[in-house]
Amino acid sequence: MNKKSIRNVNLKGKRVFDRV
């Protein structure tokens, strides 16, 4: 939801932020 969430996902290398 927040920009922090997208950064956390980037660390794992997932594409969850793609849904945002």
Swiss-Prot record:
Annotated region (Disordered), positions in chain: 1-20
Keywords on this record? ATP-binding, Cytoplasm, Glycolysis, Kinase, Nucleotide-binding, Stress response, Transferase
User: Looking at the UniProt record for this protein, which Gene Ontology cellular component terms does it annotate, in alphabetical order?
Assistant: cytoplasm
Catalytic activity annotation: (2R)-3-phosphoglycerate + ATP = (2R)-3-phospho-glyceroyl phosphate + ADP
Listed pathway(s): Carbohydrate degradation; glycolysis; pyruvate from D-glyceraldehyde 3-phosphate: step 2/5
Per the record, the similarity remark reads:
Belongs to the phosphoglycerate kinase family.
Subunit structure of this chain's protein: Monomer.
Q: What is this protein called?
A: Phosphoglycerate kinase
